[in-house]
């Protein structure tokens, strides 16, 4: 298994206690793969301190900051892919930098952004 980056759809599904998401997350952790979550994805999903399942998922992830360099890459990807979703662009930029796959519920937009990044990562649909 390779590294993975989670998008907002994964966090939302985990917060809703979707069993398949939790099962796949556990398999990754047992294989020694710590999923990466860009901090802007957390911003997009976090609404309340009572989101226990969200915080539980994030405790098994590496939440990475949005660096200035990654922000510039994400901005270029938005232009190249003709996309408007800033958070998806950060997900794609992070995946490209880490040479990671992306777990997403937004296949089409992530695909365009990964293609714009000329990234080799695969998309794993929710």
Provide a role label for each language-model segment.
Residues 1-37, 46-59:
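Short, well-structured N-terminal submotif of metal-dependent ribonuclease cores
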Residues 10-11, 41-42, 70, 90-91, ...:
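Alpha-helix capping/helix-boundary segments
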Residues 21-22, 42, 51-54, 71-74, ...:
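A general structural signal for well-ordered alpha-helical segments in protein cores
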Residues 34, 62, 120-122:
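Conserved beta-strand segments of alpha/beta enzyme cores
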Residues 37, 65, 86, 104-105:
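Short beta-strand scaffold positions
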Residues 52-56, 81-82, 120-122:
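Short, hinge-like loop/turn segments at secondary-structure boundaries
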Residues 61-81, 107:
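Acidic catalytic patch
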Residues 96-126:
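Acidic, PIN/NYN-like endoribonuclease modules and their adjacent C-terminal/linker elements
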């Amino acid at each position: 298994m390779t590294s993975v980056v989670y998008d907002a759809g994964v966090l939302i599904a985990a917060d809703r206690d979707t069993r398949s998401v939790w099962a796949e997350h556990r398999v990754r952790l047992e294989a020694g793969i710590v999923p990466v979550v860009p901090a802007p994805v957390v911003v997009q999903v976090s609404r309340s301190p009572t989101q226990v399942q969200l915080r539980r998922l994030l405790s098994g992830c590496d939440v990475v900051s949005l660096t200035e360099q990654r922000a510039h890459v994400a901005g270029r990807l938005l232009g190249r892919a003709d996309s408007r979703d800033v958070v998806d662009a950060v997900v794609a930029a992070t995946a490209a930098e880490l040479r990671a796959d992306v777990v997403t519920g937004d296949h089409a937009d992530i695909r365009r952004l990964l293609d714009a990044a000329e990234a080799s990562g695969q998309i794993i649909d929710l």
